[in-house]
Each structure stands twice: as C-alpha cells, then as structure tokens.
Swiss-Prot record:
GO molecular function terms listed in the Swiss-Prot or TrEMBL record: RNA binding; zinc ion binding
Keywords: Cytoplasm, Metal-binding, mRNA processing, mRNA splicing, Nucleus, Repeat, RNA-binding, Zinc, Zinc-finger
SMART domains: ZnF_C3H1
Subcellular location: Nucleus; Cytoplasm; Cytoplasmic granule
Protein name in UniProt: Muscleblind-like protein 1
Organism: Gallus gallus (Chicken)
Gene Ontology BP term (one): mRNA processing
Name of one Pfam family that matches: zf-CCCH
Source domain of life: Eukaryota
InterPro entries given in the database record: Znf-CCCH_Muscleblind-like, Znf_CCCH
Coiled-coil regions listed: none
Family membership: Belongs to the muscleblind family.
Amino acid sequence: MAVSVTPIRDTKWLTLEVCREFQRGTCSRPDTECKFAHPSKSCQVENGRVIACFDSLKGRCSRENCKYLHPPPHLKTQLEINGRNNLIQQKNMAMLAQQMQLANAMMPGAPLQPVPMFSVAPSLATNASAAFNPYLGPVSPGLVPAEILPTAPMLVAGNPGVPVPAAAAAAAQKLMRTDRLEVCREYQRGNCNRGENDCRFAHPADSAMIDTNDNTVTVCMDYIKGRCSREKCKYFHPPAHLQAKIKAAQYQVNQAAAAQAAATAAAMGIPQAVLPPLPKRPALEKTNGATAVFNTGIFQYQQALANMQLQQHTAFLPPVPMVHGATPATVSAATTSATSVPFAATATANQIPIISAEHLTSHKYVTQM
C-alpha cells in the first residue's frame, strides 16, 4: 500500500502576536524595537494575531494596501527561523512516511493508520521528572502501524497514581528554559546595593528585554559562546558569574534528560543501543505561539518501536530436507544420530520430520504446522 503525505499550506509559522499596548495606543516602543507586531490599518487582525506577508519576506510584494503584515527586520529574522523549522518538520514527515511504507512492505498484514496530534499523557503535565525526557514529547501527526499502538494512544511515564506537587512541576518547567534569568526586583525598584557582577539576579539595562509574565530576561546564547556581533542586541548579555550559572543549569538538564531516557528505555525493554542520541533543544523558543517547534524525539521513539515490532514478527523457518528413496530404518538411524548431539535435541523436536519417498506413496499428504 502506497503512503503519501498531502502537503498542507500551514500559515502558523507566519503568525505574530499583536502588541496590546499598540492597540491601546500606549506603546512607547517603535515597531522596529517592539517584540510584538504593530500592524497597519489595512492588516487583518484575528484574536490578537496577524499573519505576515510571505511575499514581503521575499522582497517581492507589490500590493498597495496589503492585508498581511510587512514585518520589520527583527521580526523578519524570527519568521525566517520559523520557516526553517517548518521545512524541517515537513522533511521529517516525508521520511517517516517512507519508513512506514517500507515497514508495511515487509509486513503486509499491518495496515497504516493516520495518527492525529494528541498529548502523550495527562500525567506529564504534573510529572517533574518526565519534563526532561525528549522521547515523551507531544506526538506530531504521522503514520504508525496499527499493532504497535496501544488500545488508547497514550504513553504514561512513571507512576501516574503518585501525584507530584505543583511546586515541583513549576520548578521543572523553569529548569527547562535554561536561556532565561530572573530579573532582580530590588534593581527594578532602584534599591539593589549589589553590583551587576555580584547579584545572583539579572540587571538588564533595557526594560524592554524583561518579560512581564514571569519577570525574566532571555539570555543571548551567542554572547555565551562569544560570537554575538549584533550592534544593539535585544537579548541580555549576562556577566561572568551568571554565565557560569547558565552553563551549570544546562549541564543539569542534559544529565536529567539522559537519566530519564535511560530509565524509560529500561522500563519499556528497549535496548540502549536502539535509542539514538538525545536531540538538541530547538534554536528558538518564543512565547508568541507562532513557532512551529518540531521535536524529533517522537520519530526516533516510533522508529525504535517499529524495529522491535519487526524483530517480533520475524520468525525463523528452518530448512526441511527431503530424502528420496530412504527406508524407515535409515530415517530412524538419522534421527537417533541427530538427537545424540546435545545442542541438536531441541532443534530436532521443533523441526518437521523427514519424510521418505515410500511414505509419500503409501500415505496421504499431511500438513504439519
């Protein structure tokens, strides 16, 4: 059965959130500095979001009053990254379809069924340990053989009967974002007596960097690696002691992810050699809901399950020699000599007995399974 993935025109990666302060007319930042969109009157805004003009990204929009947003340079860079992530997702979907087609060719009795997008398990929202496991991320739409899916398409990590405190889940969620630092509240009030190089919290020079939802700033990872060349970077450049803190947090997250992946593989009976290395964190994690972040872990996990299923369905069929013109005495002697070998005792018991030509002529054919 041929498998095809119908290309769907997805505009989610072109979607940007509109600045609420701009809608009220109170935004003090221009459109070239604000991290949210400042659409013109001709743009269509739906539910506080606007779609960017694809032709504008290519520099070929000739419409006089375009109903799509023509983003400024910093938002254009963000959309280009979103577009690359979207292309990677489509490429991996095509590769998965080819793999499932090959698996179906090897197992003709395994029909392929489309799998809709769903959350892996409700307990993952409150399971702090499972938050670091890339193999238990949200499942993207794909094609999976029906028999390797459970009755209810859901994977449960850990013990769902044991509740995890909300504080632990919140701490796990905070540790996932190792590229963020909490802003010093005393510094915001102007009362911090510790310097920028001594305080354990961030002292951003520009208040536009601060995310008002959780009072944090996003760290410039290029600056951490010593390669930020932007003249006016919109991300926070931390001092040396905070850089060490970020690197330590990243190391802890990687170690926790590796330990959780190994524990999950051992619990499910998957050999460690089957699981590929842990995927890297996505390039950007934005809070505007526009990024179509692709998680490759689920495809690696599904491929491991498919390999296990192929191994289970592969049965060993021993060759059945046919001896023509042999007498019953010869056959019994051959059987006796074979069973005298220690390791051949179990093999001869499972094989189909040797049938002579005289037996075929004097008896009917009997099919032995």
